[in-house]
Amino acid sequence: MTTLTGKTVLLTGASRGLGVYIARALAKEQATVVCVSRSQSGLAQTCNAVKAAGGKAIAIPFDVRNTSQLSALVQQAQDIVGPIDVLINNAGIEINGTFANYSLAEIQSIFNTNLLAAMELTRLLLPSMMERGSGRIVNIASLAGKKGVAFNSVYSASKAGLIMWTDAMRQELVGTGVNISVVCPGYVSQTGMTVDTRVSAPKLAGISTPKSVANAVVKAIKNKTTEVIVNQNPITESLTKLMLAVGQISPTSVDRIYRWFGVVDFNQKRAENRVKDGYVAVESHRS
């Protein structure tokens, strides 16, 4: 799929954060974007942005945490636009905290949004893609899924699951004409975790722009890229890959690097702020 012109894309988490930037990037490629999110007002704004950028947009308000109802979402989308060429699983939720303080409902909410919704949407759309011998699936994960992050353990686990599932599916789909990719951004400016003005994201760890992440998604679709690390610039990305490789040999060495970068302190402060806020869920860069 060297071009997205005339292709139909189903994008979850489209109402804010990264979702808006991804939708705009797709619009510039002349794609039709089926925008899915819980926020009807946010979807309207995203659809307007898509149309302004030269694309076509359809809004479908839906909470992807309701995984048992996702078949209705897929049917509604296909009734409106026909076959889906590209699925982008971007919806995500993040709740910082010490693990002992998580409720089962919070854990289930994170996994339903970050992992199970992606699996179920893929399961529902994959047969038609395989029948046509063409399709793209892009999962938006996180560097937190490549290296566990203290005080964000459930989010890390959900994203690690997304990465490993993508890896397994990539092997399973060889020869089908359907390709699956995973994009792993680090901290992203102007979105989710970085908008808490009470604590600044650790600059030493690298901070990317949402536009750069959106561009990486488009490139992954066009180039069939297996895995994309997005972290500020090519040099920082190369160092990140090296650090992750070292972590496979000596995990505690990278633990110390994370503490030195300020990653652990950052997440601990966000967890403390969550307690002060009365345990309100802090959604990540897409919802």
Swiss-Prot record:
Its EC number is 1.3.1.-. Coiled coil: none annotated. Signal peptide: none annotated. NAD(+) binds at residues 11-35. Substrate binds at S142. It comes from the Bacteria. One of its GO terms (biological process) is heterocyst development. The active site is at Y155 (proton acceptor). One of its GO terms (molecular function) is oxidoreductase activity. The keyword Cell membrane does not apply. Gene3D superfamilies: NAD(P)-binding Rossmann-like Domain. GO terms for cellular component: membrane. Keywords: Heterocyst, Oxidoreductase. PANTHER family: DEHYDROGENASE/REDUCTASE SDR FAMILY MEMBER 7B, DEHYDROGENASE_REDUCTASE SDR FAMILY MEMBER 7B. Belongs to the short-chain dehydrogenases/reductases (SDR) family. May be involved in repressing heterocyst differentiation and may be essential for preventing all vegetative cells from differentiating. This is Ketoacyl reductase HetN. It comes from Nostoc sp. (strain PCC 7120 / SAG 25.82 / UTEX 2576).
